């Protein structure tokens, strides 16, 4: 859903490279332990446990009539992520979960593996608008643990008011650490139909692209196929290509909903 940033300065990169040089010079293969890319899939049972834990003491509000029903949704997924450093790469599981939390705004968390999660806050507004005030990615890869938080204004739409094909919108968001401005450019690509469990679902196809031009440089376009009346993400496609500190991070994913009813 959003760009992950992990190289915040050159010191971490230098330490990793130095470790590789020292160990490899000994003629061993222990360097693989330093750069081993761990991938622990989050199954449905674990996703349900996370959802139930986060629902404690939360209550429904009237605004939720225009947001996805809370619960755990299952998606058919392809794709993966990689770093240019030492060929670090891993694939996402073929089945992943999105956890929709209860609240005034919905928190939608894609949890393919425990080492990589993406959370989008989705709020409903007047005239059918769906906005995205916050995007959070947590990542553990190549020995580095990071959390990337992007805050956006009310005009950062997932779906604008009276959405029609060809609509365009922009907003300026802020990356918390390092503090940098990020441009969000949105586009409505029009209505579409997606088949879910044998049922045809009418959706609106939108895209928003995050452009980074600071410590990180690159783009992060994400396509959403959304049910306008509920904000349910029926399909999502994400591409990431960003360079930071001389290291390039790449991600691609396509997730399609397999059942319209969530598990709770």
Task: Identify the residue ranges that each predicted region occupies.
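An acidic-aromatic
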Residues: 103-166
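Secreted/surface-exposed cysteine- and glycine-rich disulfide frameworks
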Residues: 142-196
